[in-house]
């Protein structure tokens, strides 16, 4: 292998902010932030969703912004659907 062309592989702490859980995973991601866990300093990255919080993996439904879009659509055009059903 050629020297000095591969990224540094190290243990990184990923913080799932939606459930406030920390994961120590090997990664090559670059970050300037650090965190100390169990007396050891690790590079630190925040994430919004992980396998522990994603609805597909948890089986739990979460409210999403698109539900507001559906409600807004129904409010605007729902009267046309009701008129067609009535006759």
UniProtKB/Swiss-Prot annotation:
Q: Gene name on record? A: rpmE2-2
Q: Which InterPro entries does the entry mention?
A: Ribosomal_bL28/bL31-like_sf (IPR034704), Ribosomal_bL31 (IPR002150), Ribosomal_bL31_B (IPR027493), Ribosomal_bL31_sf (IPR042105)
Assembly and interactions? Part of the 50S ribosomal subunit.
Name the SUPFAM superfamilies on file.
L28p-like
A GO biological process of this protein is:
translation
- Tell me one GO molecular function of this protein: structural constituent of ribosome
Is this entry keyworded Nucleotide-binding?
A: no
One cellular component term from this protein's GO annotations in UniProt: ribonucleoprotein complex
Q: Does the keyword Ribosomal protein apply?
A: yes
Family stated for the protein in its record: Belongs to the bacterial ribosomal protein bL31 family. Type B subfamily.
**How is this protein named in the record?**
Large ribosomal subunit protein bL31B-2/bL31B-3
Disulphide bond pairs: none
Cited Pfam families: Ribosomal_L31 (PF01197)
Q: Which PANTHER family match?
A: 50S RIBOSOMAL PROTEIN L31, CHLOROPLASTIC, LARGE RIBOSOMAL SUBUNIT PROTEIN BL31C
Q: Which PROSITE patterns match?
A: RIBOSOMAL_L31 (PS01143)
Arranged from A to Z, the UniProt key words for this protein are: Ribonucleoprotein, Ribosomal protein
Please name the source species: Escherichia coli O157:H7
């Amino acid at each position: 292998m050629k020297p000095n062309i591969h990224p540094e592989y190290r243990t990184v702490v990923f913080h799932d902010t939606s459930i406030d859980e920390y994961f120590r995973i090997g990664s090559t991601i670059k970050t300037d932030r650090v965190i100390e866990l169990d007396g050891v300093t690790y590079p630190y990255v925040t994430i919004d969703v992980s396998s522990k919080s994603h609805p597909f993996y948890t089986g739990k439904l979460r409210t999403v912004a698109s539900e507001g879009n559906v409600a807004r659509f129904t409010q605007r055009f729902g009267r046309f659907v009701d008129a067609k059903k009535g006759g």
